[in-house]
């Protein structure tokens, strides 16, 4: 049975873990979103989130974006490769509605799945 949880072990928690992904990442991006990925030595994917005040001024907007990314990751984790992923928000992300945002995320997850199969 596929587990659809988002436990602590599925998150990037320390600055060292984030730095590892930023060093030599695979990138999939749109004008509003970048998802960086790097292979990990675990058997499951992990997710880290970066949503800066520079791009979304209000906390409730940043929280909405983070909540949508976590939910998308939670539902897609069984298909994703054993990589560490870092979600990076860029300008214009606040203008996307929830359904458009979810479609973009799904497209980026698919791109990372294809990149992982090639390498």
Curated annotation (Swiss-Prot):
A family per Pfam: Ribonuclease_P
Biological classification of the source: Bacteria, Pseudomonadati, Pseudomonadota, Gammaproteobacteria, Pasteurellales
Gene Ontology CC terms: ribonuclease P complex
Keyword Membrane recorded: no
InterPro entries: Ribosomal_Su5_D2-typ_SF (IPR020568), Ribsml_uS5_D2-typ_fold_subgr (IPR014721), RNase_P (IPR000100), RNase_P_CS (IPR020539)
Swiss-Prot/TrEMBL keywords: Endonuclease, Hydrolase, Nuclease, RNA-binding, tRNA processing
Described purpose of this protein according to its UniProt entry: RNaseP catalyzes the removal of the 5'-leader sequence from pre-tRNA to produce the mature 5'-terminus. It can also cleave other RNA substrates such as 4.5S RNA. The protein component plays an auxiliary but essential role in vivo by binding to the 5'-leader sequence and broadening the substrate specificity of the ribozyme.
SUPFAM superfamilies per UniProt: Ribosomal protein S5 domain 2-like
Quaternary context: Consists of a catalytic RNA component (M1 or rnpB) and a protein subunit.
EC number: 3.1.26.5
Any GO BP annotation: tRNA 5'-leader removal
UniProt GO molecular function: 3'-tRNA processing endoribonuclease activity; ribonuclease P activity; tRNA binding
Catalytic activity: Endonucleolytic cleavage of RNA, removing 5'-extranucleotides from tRNA precursor
Protein name: Ribonuclease P protein component
HAMAP family, A to Z: RNase_P (MF_00227)
Family: Belongs to the RnpA family.
């Amino acid at each position: 049975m596929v587990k659809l949880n988002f436990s602590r072990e599925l998150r990037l928690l320390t600055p060292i873990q984030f730095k590892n992904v930023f060093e030599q990442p695979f990138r999939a991006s749109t004008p509003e979103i970048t998802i960086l990925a790097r292979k990990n030595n675990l058997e499951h994917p992990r997710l880290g989130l970066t949503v800066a005040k520079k791009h979304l001024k209000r906390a409730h907007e940043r929280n909405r974006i983070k909540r949508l990314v976590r939910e998308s990751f939670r539902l897609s984790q069984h298909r994703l490769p054993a990589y560490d992923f870092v979600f990076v928000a860029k300008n214009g992300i606040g203008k996307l509605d929830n359904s458009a945002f979810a479609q973009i995320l799904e497209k980026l997850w698919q791109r990372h799945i294809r990149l992982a199969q090639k390498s």
